[in-house]
Structure formats: structure tokens, C-alpha cells
Amino acid sequence: MRTGMQAELVLDAKCATGESPVWRADEQALYWVDIPAKQLHRWHAATGEHSVWTGDEMLACIAPRAGHSGEWIAGMESGLFAIATRADGTLAASPIAGAAHAEHGMRFNDGRCDRQGRFWAGTMQMDMAAAHEVGRVYRYQADVNAGAALRPQFEHMIVPNGLAFSPDGKTMYLSDSHPLVQTIWAFDYDIDTGTPHGRRVFVDMKPLPGRPDGAAVDADGCYWICGNDAGLVHRFTPEGKLDRSLEVPVKKPAMCAFGGPQLDTLYVTSIRPGGDLSDQPLAGGVFALRPGVKGLPEPECRF
């Protein structure tokens, strides 16, 4: 069911590829990245203040790091880094683990932590038209037996996306947003070992409007995913049934995240493609929807 709920413009950020929105309750602020610009953005809800920091590599996905005030774990071009903001508008980046990319021209893409603080992130070939199945999905955790390690869990993907976890952490979601795939999978997830199993098709997005991009899970266990190219954000029940679709005034919503004091605002980042934007002048902006449900706090990385 498509609803006519009005999306509110939060910020006309003009991001080339706005991704990985994360709400920080301690700051009452929304963070996100602009991948090709190598930038981390922050918007304070109370004041509307907008800050930007620029790094040395493309910045694709972020998750807050527990016990390290102001620090993030980030998936970038060459691997995982711990990043922090500097007063001069730059990002300090300390390497954690390098990624064994299958070919040149790859970077990290979508990523987040599970409920236990393990970091999950996928890699992709930036030349999407090539449709090379060289993408991997990695898990990073501190292993008491083998030490901290970045290990591939899935291979032969094109554009891994849509990572999310159910409220109890026992279901993991993953998609491939390439036009040739457009599928969301669900897995049973062992919260003790961080091992997914029982892979099954959760939603085949090919008959639906939009390619599956970034995602979030609400407190009811429903799965929200941006319908890239369709200007929609879809909500699916835990059984994979389409519950509703909310419109945003851009063609390429990229990822969504719940935030606000009550976690009842759904923030949506977007992509600003090249070419004529007369029909979507706000492309690359950040939007807010109030869908009448609450989200969950974003898990922190625990390493």
C-alpha cells in the first residue's frame, strides 16, 4: 500500500551518494556519509547545525564504537578504519583491518553492527555496469582464540546491501541491489557465534518498484528498505509481506535510519545523480518521515 505521507526536508545536503545514516542519542544528532566525496556529515536536530569532515578515502559505512567517545568504525576503500573528527574539518583514520579485494576499483559499501557489536560490511566493484560477482560480505569481531579478524562470510555478490538485524538479533537480512539480482535474503543468526545459516529469499524485489538499497528494522520487527530508482521506502513484515510504501521527493533514496528523541522519525538519505535534476532538485538531500512506529537504537561496535 502506497501512502501519501509528506516527507520533510531535513537538509538540502546535495550529497552525491548519501549513505549510512546513524542517529546518536547522546548528541541528538544524525550522522551520515557521502561516499565519493569522502565526507562524514552531522546534523544537530535542535539547532539545525550542519558539520562536514573530509577524509583521504571514500567513506561508505559507519557504526559508533563503544568505549571510544566520538569514534566510529568505518568501511572505506581499502578496509576498516577507526575514524574521528578533527577541528580542522578533516578525519583522523587509524587502520584496523585491510580487505582482500578480488580486483581493482573496489570499496566497501553497506555495513553495520549486529546486536552483539560485531561489524558486518560488504564490498563491491565501483563499476556496477560490469556486474562482476566479486563482492564479499565480511564480519569483523574480536576472537579470543584467534585474535581480531576480518573474515569473509559471503562471496560472489555484486552489490551487497540492506544489512540489518531483527530486534532479538536472531534474524539477519542481506540484499543484493544490482539490477540483475534485486533480492533480499533472511538468515537464522546465531548470536553467540555470529554465524548466519538457513539462507532463504525474504523478498524478491524484481516485481516491486525500486531496487533494494539500505535498510533498517523497527521495534515491531518490520524491515524498512529504500526502493532506489522509485522514490519509495518500503516496509515489510517479518514474514516478508509488503505492509506499505512511503514516498520521498527524489528518485534515489539510499538508506534509512530511525532517530529523534523517541526514535519515531525515519531519516532517509539520498543520491544526487548527474544530468538534469529539474524534476528532483532536492536529490542528495536528507528527509524525515513519521510513520507512526518506533525504531531501535543503533548497536555499537564492541572492539
Place the predicted regions along the sequence by residue:
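Beta-rich, blade/repeat-based domains predominating
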Residues: 13-27, 56-75, 101-118, 154-171, ...
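Loop/turn-rich, solvent-exposed surfaces of beta-rich toroidal or solenoidal domains
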Residues: 187, 203-241
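A short loop-to-beta-strand structural motif that recurs across blades of beta-propeller domains
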Residues: 39-41, 79, 135-138, 183-185, ...
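Blade-level signature of beta-propeller repeat domains, shared across WD40, Kelch, NHL, RCC1
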Residues: 258-303
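Conserved beta-strand positions in repeat-built beta-propeller and related beta-rich domains
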Residues: 24-25, 30-35, 72-78, 119-131, ...
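A short beta-strand motif characteristic of beta-propeller blades
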Residues: 6-12, 48-54, 94-101, 148-155, ...
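Short loop/turn segments immediately following beta-strands, especially the blade-tip
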Residues: 84-89, 142-145, 186-195, 291-296
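Hydrophobic alpha-helical segments and helix pairs
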Residues: 90-153
